[in-house]
Amino acid sequence: MTHMLNAAADRVKWTRSSAAKRAACLVAAAYALKTLYPIIGKRLKQSGHGKKKAAAYPAAENTEILHCTETICEKPSPGVNADFFKQLLELRKILFPKLVTTETGWLCLHSVALISRTFLSIYVAGLDGKIVKSIVEKKPRTFIIKLIKWLMIAIPATFVNSAIRYLECKLALAFRTRLVDHAYETYFTNQTYYKVINMDGRLANPDQSLTEDIMMFSQSVAHLYSNLTKPILDVMLTSYTLIQTATSRGASPIGPTLLAGLVVYATAKVLKACSPKFGKLVAEEAHRKGYLRYVHSRIIANVEEIAFYRGHKVEMKQLQKSYKALADQMNLILSKRLWYIMIEQFLMKYVWSSSGLIMVAIPIITATGFADGEDGQKQVMVSERTEAFTTARNLLASGADAIERIMSSYKEVTELAGYTARVYNMFWVFDEVKRGIYKRTAVIQESESHSKNGAKVELPLSDTLAIKGKVIDVDHGIICENVPIITPAGEVVASRLNFKVEEGMHLLITGPNGCGKSSLFRILSGLWPVYEGVLYKPPPQHMFYIPQRPYMSLGSLRDQVIYPDSVDDMHDKGYTDQDLERILHNVHLYHIVQREGGWDAVMDWKDVLSGGEKQRMGMARMFYHKPKYALLDECTSAVSIDVEGKIFQAAKGAGISLLSITHRPSLWKYHTHLLQFDGEGGWRFEQLDTAIRLTLSEEKQKLESQLAGIPKMQQRLNELCKILGEDSVLKTIKNEDETS
């Protein structure tokens, strides 16, 4: 090898060191070409194959749904692309709503700590070189002084290291707090929390997005800022220091710089080619975690029904299936990380270490600024080269570690892309639902030539059912003018309702199951949109809805009566505990005050109170809020008839207009008008004559009881005819009627 370098140098008139540097560059270039060529060729083949596949199946990219004016496409998987940066910039507006914020303060402190750590690293690298030089020169006094300096600098260095971790956690917590505050404000505005589940189908598990997704996104952003800012600064400062050191010693930094750039570039290309789609994998993992949590919460919410049916085996299989899907996804991620980290460690630990030794050796070997050639200065020469080598090695190790963290961060960036897509999608859905834009998910079947599996796409209701109706708040009366009842799925339950309920009127609403009775209450409460017509109704504070199963909130007994008011709201309205006691007397519920330990008793009220007590608590809330209109949806079905009648009479006496859904004839006398649905889209609104309706009801029950025995009598008659071998007169008449 030496003869070859000498011959090449003599022919082109290069120095031996110049020939060695050029030879090293050529070897590195050849190695990089050998490494990158198969990867690039593979990528080009995949790209060409993808284009051919796209040309062969042009209809697979876009899927059109019948009755939809908009072409709907499947969502692209999250990745580091233009969409990712666009979503991140949109979320930045939430994280930093203005220039001077708490988050900005923590970010500045974190940046100062990162910059301080970089300068400390450079200073420690130089100090290490001086310590090694003092050892080589056999100067114990100098060694002790330098060692003391090294120990003294360790105090601020360790503090800065601890501060970096502390500030990173504080920054992540500040980001999470900002996102949670904004999410909660949007989630509880305009009843979005209801509509995002019942009217929209894009978010399967909002609780997952509001908790874990926001947490993981905040931690990932803060960690990436730390893992990218400091390494980039380290690379810049260490490179500048190394170049300055090499130049001051008379060595050329071009060769090592080119080698470093080539190695880093080759490593980046290899890692990018080998990197799995971590963004898509992490997003799918988060989705499966959310579904597993949903299955658990579903069991908890229906635990009594499952126990009655003894359905524990079915539910256990569902849980096991959901957990297995999550475990399979986690195993897939772990297996892909195994091979990716192996390749990453090989390139960054061993390939970079060998390249680093070459980069450090070349400037020191070729440098002319050391005292060389004189016998009296041999010791100085050795110590200076040792110091330069140690300092350069430490600086290079610091720079290599920084580049390694930058390149390793690509995997974390792809994971951040998954969290960013989920959090951004959550805010996007919340905003659209708040503005009355709903989209539901439909499953369509592709043609057999493309796929045998159904593709899930989003069907915007706004394309099929435009919301053209108007809702106008008025002080008096409820008026429906051509208002249809349409479910979130787009089914028309009743068409063009027209009725008017004035103050002092009491409306009874009847009809078979699924005819639209409760749906009408959802429209009046603003939960469902008015697709056509005009709805005049009082403001929400003048209407109060009581369901069949009232919600029991967390808190004291007092909180149950005044829900959703707080104690301060109660005092502002002028209520006292004595007033609440009178309300409980009205609904025959005062005994629970003594039974449960007073107004300040805190319990899990949904388990403490019986079904009838919970329904009476719902009626107590009505007397507390004193609305103009009360929407009663089978709210006293578990209350005895005598107590139920007293409550309704007290409500009428309090001046509350009742809109009641009930099947009990005993309550008809408390109403003045009737809205009856026929279950086929028809309806009628009329004044209620209780006496006539009760008479008709009694006649209906009498006929039902008489006709109930006819099938048994007919069966017995047939048996007697067979035994006697005779025909029945009724059969003869029936046959004659059929013949004629």
Curated annotation (Swiss-Prot):
CDD domains: ABCD_peroxisomal_ALDP. The chain crosses the membrane at residues 107-127, 144-164, 251-271, 351-371. Residues 478-704 form the ABC transporter domain. Glycans are attached at N190, N227. It is a multi-pass membrane protein. It is found in: Peroxisome membrane. One of its GO terms (molecular function) is fatty acyl-CoA hydrolase activity. The keyword ATP-binding applies. Predominantly expressed in brain and heart. It comes from the Eukaryota. One of its GO terms (cellular component) is cytosol. Gene3D superfamilies: ABC transporter type 1, transmembrane domain, P-loop containing nucleotide triphosphate hydrolases. SUPFAM superfamilies: ABC transporter transmembrane region, P-loop containing nucleoside triphosphate hydrolases. PROSITE patterns: ABC_TM1F, ABC_TRANSPORTER_1, ABC_TRANSPORTER_2. Keywords: ATP-binding, Glycoprotein, Hydrolase, Membrane, Nucleotide-binding, Peroxisome, Translocase, Transmembrane, Transmembrane helix, Transport. The keyword Repeat does not apply. Residues 1-218 are annotated as: Interaction with PEX19. Residues 107-399 form the ABC transmembrane type-1 domain. Changing Q244K: In a pancreatic ductal adenocarcinoma sample; somatic mutation. Its main location: membrane. It catalyses: a very long-chain fatty acyl-CoA + H2O = a very long-chain fatty acid + CoA + H(+); a very long-chain fatty acid(in) + ATP + H2O = a very long-chain fatty acid(out) + ADP + phosphate + H(+). ATP-dependent transporter of the ATP-binding cassette (ABC) family involved in the transport of very long chain fatty acid (VLCFA)-CoA from the cytosol to the peroxisome lumen. Like ABCD1 seems to have fatty acyl-CoA thioesterase (ACOT) and ATPase activities, according to this model, VLCFA-CoA as free VLCFA is transpoted in an ATP-dependent manner into peroxisomes after the hydrolysis of VLCFA-CoA mediated by the ACOT activity of ABCD2. Homodimers. Homotetramers. The minimal functional unit is a homodimer but the major oligomeric form in peroxisomal membrane is a homotetramer. Forms heterodimers with ABCD1. Forms heterodimers with ABCD3. In addition to tetramers, some larger molecular assemblies are also found but represented only a minor fraction. Interacts with PEX19; facilitates ABCD2 insertion into the peroxisome membrane. This is ATP-binding cassette sub-family D member 2. It comes from Homo sapiens (Human). The gene is ABCD2.
